[in-house]
Curated annotation (Swiss-Prot):
Residues 126-142 have a biased composition (Basic and acidic residues). Switch 1, switch 2 and the interswitch regions are characteristic of Rab GTPases and mediate the interactions with Rab downstream effectors. The switch regions undergo conformational changes upon nucleotide binding which drive interaction with specific sets of effector proteins, with most effectors only binding to GTP-bound Rab. PANTHER family: DRAB5-RELATED. This is Ras-related protein Rab-20. The keyword GTP-binding applies. The gene is RAB20. Belongs to the small GTPase superfamily. Rab family. InterPro entries: P-loop_NTPase, Rab20, Small_GTP-bd, Small_GTPase. A motif (Switch 2) lies at residues 55-72. Its main location: Golgi.
Length: 234
């Protein structure tokens, strides 16, 4: 297996849908409830580069492993459930500190999952289904509760992270570009999330390669040793 050129890590509390997001993107399916033990990863080829995507466990007993998985990460996806405000709070309280081992120019995406369970998500789904002439009245999407976390809350957290990392907003992608609402169940915005990050990570790969010291020897500047009268090299 070829060594990954870069690494992306998903962090977040248990049951926010990290594994489902990753499997929706990589396997194009929505899995039954699966709890990740420790960590698991996929390898994604993007253009000519290999990017590893790590899924981490949200359970408290595996919390310490997150720092290990984040080591050297080029991007971190901080995931919460739009229906549970505490899951957003946990990102700052429990998970942000784990990112200290990531690369110094690490990118952060704030992702609110399970938007399909909200009032807005239900209405969007209902509009699509009403286009079907075979849809019975009893099959309509039932009303859902309003979101507990708004996109503006995610933007506020993103700006807090920049302060925590002592980063200037002008030197990083805008909050509006890095805050997403997704549904692993329907696939809403899942491709957009991952592919936005891939496109942002590729220039970082190129920069790292350019900064690596060259191991090539310039033989054109190499001069042969001078010989002494005894015939030995000086």
């Amino acid at each position: 297996m070829r060594k990954p050129d870069s690494k992306i890590v998903l962090l977040g509390d248990m049951n926010v849908g990290k594994t489902s997001l990753l499997q929706r993107y990589m396997e194009r399916r929505f899995p039954d409830t699966v709890s990740t033990v420790g960590g698991a990863f996929y390898l994604k080829q993007w253009r000519s580069y290999n990017i590893s995507i790590w899924d981490t466990a949200g359970r408290e007993q595996f919390h310490g492993l997150g720092s290990m998985y984040c080591r050297g990460a080029a991007a971190i996806i901080l995931t919460y459930d739009v229906n549970h405000r505490q899951s957003l709070v946990e990102l700052e309280d429990r998970f942000l500190g784990l990112t200290d081992t990531a690369s110094k120019d690490c990118l952060f995406a704030i992702v609110g999952n399970k938007v399909d369970l909200t009032e807005e998500g239900a209405l969007a789904g209902q509009e699509k289904e009403e286009c079907s002439p075979n849809m019975d009245a009893g099959d309509r999407v039932s009303p859902r509760a309003p979101k507990q976390v708004q996109l503006e809350d995610a933007v506020a957290l993103y700006k807090k992270i920049l302060k925590y990392k002592m980063l200037d907003e002008q030197d990083v992608p805008a909050a509006e570009q890095m805050c997403f609402e997704t549904s692993a169940k329907t696939g809403y915005n899942v491709d957009l999330l991952f592919e936005t990050l891939f496109d942002l990570v590729v220039p970082m790969i190129l920069q790292q390669r350019a900064e690596r010291p060259s191991h090539t020897v310039d033989i054109s500047s190499h001069k042969p040793p001078k010989r002494t009268r005894s015939g030995c090299c000086a």
